[in-house]
Amino acid sequence: MWFLFLLLPLWAGCAEPGDSEWVHLPSKCEVCKYVALELKSSFDETSRTRELIDTRYGFLEDDKKKKKIKYTTSDIRLIEVTEGLCSRLLEYNLHKERTGSNRFAKGMSETFQTLHHLVHKGVKVVMDIPYELWNETSAEVADMKKQCDVMMENYEEVIEDWYRNHQDEDLSEFLCARHVLKGQDQSCLSEQGDSRKGDTGPSTGTKKQKKQGEKKNKSKKQNSGSKEEKKQMDQPMAAKEEL
């Protein structure tokens, strides 16, 4: 049995928020950057439907005259997107091997991928935190979610204005540069995303389905081949019976 002892500050949850050596809380720029990114993503996910919303309730004569409106321009879509927006930030992890705002990304960090692989190979990894807490939300990500809640409340009208009148403009520029970070540090907005990707979780099953499909095709070919051979063998037997 191999032993690996690590006393590295890999998990921010072990330290107090005031300990700068362990915890580097997200800046206002970083929070706004990922809030805008998740807003874009969520609006994009809900933009593909052609659903119509019926606004006629039939209680008043004026209500009967109202027409159906598109879901993509409705208040319902805006509410659904913004309501659970900050919870999406909890899908992020802290990647301490990266710099700048790229330290926040979805998927497992390279450091923890390596540690998990060592554990799966039978190496006993001893750290200052138990194995069960390796995948817990870090203090930085928890704080980003907290700041997001406040930001969404304070800039609700700005987001609504973009949704109704400025969807042709970049959301990061409109929300962060012009409003949230006006006159403040905006350097993180221009940082390019890290091309490295973490372990995003379990397989989607595509490869497995592909293999199963290949097996089915192979089985079909074998069955068709055996049927053909049987047919060829039956023909001489039938000829003998006729004789």
Swiss-Prot record:
Q: Which GO terms describe its cellular component?
A: endoplasmic reticulum
Query: Coiled-coil region(s) at which residues?
Result: 136-160
- Organism in which the protein naturally occurs: Xenopus laevis
Q: What is this protein called?
A: Protein canopy homolog 3
Q: Which InterPro entries match?
A: DUF3456
Gene name of this polypeptide: cnpy3
Q: Where does the source fall among the domains of life? A: Eukaryota
Question: Keywords in UniProt for this one?
Answer: Chaperone, Coiled coil, Disulfide bond, Endoplasmic reticulum, Immunity, Innate immunity, Signal
Disordered: where is this region? 186-243
- General function of this protein: Toll-like receptor (TLR)-specific co-chaperone for HSP90B1. Required for proper TLR folding and hence controls TLR exit from the endoplasmic reticulum. Consequently, required for immune responses.
Q: Where in the cell is it found?
A: Endoplasmic reticulum
Detail the disulphide connectivity of this chain as listed in its UniProt entry: C29-C188, C32-C176, C86-C148
Q: What is the lineage of its organism?
A: Eukaryota, Metazoa, Chordata, Craniata, Vertebrata
